[in-house]
Amino acid sequence: TLRDFLRKDSLRQQQEKFRIRGIREKEVLSSCGHVAGRTRFDREGALSCNPKLKYHKLNETMRACFYEGSWRREKCRSFEIFASQGDYPLKGFHYLLAAMPEILQEFPQAHISVAGISITGYGTLKEKLKISGYGKYLRDLMKVHDLEGRVSVLGNLTDRQMKEAYLNSHVFVCPSALENSPNSLGEAMLLGVPCVASRTGGIPDMAKGDKSALFFEKGNVHELAACILR
């Protein structure tokens, strides 16, 4: 898109930026003596860069408001699916959109809410000029799957607003292509929200499959739909 060209930020250019970050991260880890982490994924990754590292397990503390209150089925919005982010490909929002036709076959009332800024707006000239390649792809997916009116973008949310979004949802979905230990999944589980997450990176170390979360193989939209339908 024009925006991607002017900002030198196409999907391939974003891939290259991640590649460069990876090289720099390896350089940093190679010069360190100690590193802190919390999953097998980050431990194995760090030690593969520098086998001499001393690894320290350090679990995260969530924001205070997520330790209070709990999800209740009778108070949530039925068939509401919540995702915490979807503005770049690694977050896997396109997988959730692609899974919607199967979900809608069984539950026509299903609706997606996603936190963060809208990257699919195309109503004004400014929005048409600013849309990214990924935003256009998401927009095309919504057209192909007839999802107009079934996806709401909530904007940037405070911690309290995020908590409200979790509690209002019927299920929280983390469809990412790669994660280490996403805070969003931790927050949702603390509140007792039913969770669906991709089996990737460090996520399997955060939750017990079929107990605190349902896992699907990353990118498998049929498994994703099946987990949500459960």
Roles of regions detected by a PLM:
Residues N156, E164-S169:
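Short alpha-helical donor nucleotide-sugar binding micro-motif in glycosyltransferases
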Residues R72-K91, L97-M100, I112-S113:
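Conserved donor-binding/catalytic core segment of Leloir-type glycosyltransferases
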Residues K126-N156, R160:
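Nucleotide-activated donor-binding/catalytic signature segment of Leloir-type glycosyltransferases, i.e.
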Residues G209-D210, L214-V221, R230:
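Conserved acidic donor-binding segment of nucleotide-sugar-dependent glycosyltransferases
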Residues A177:
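Aromatic "clamp/platform" in nucleotide-sugar-dependent glycosyltransferases that forms part
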Residues P194-A197:
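Short hydrophobic beta-strand element within catalytic cores of glycosyltransferases
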Residues L2-H34, S48:
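Membrane-proximal helix-turn-helix segments that form the acceptor-binding/catalytic region
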Residues F172-V173:
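A short hydrophobic beta-strand element within the catalytic core of glycosyltransferases
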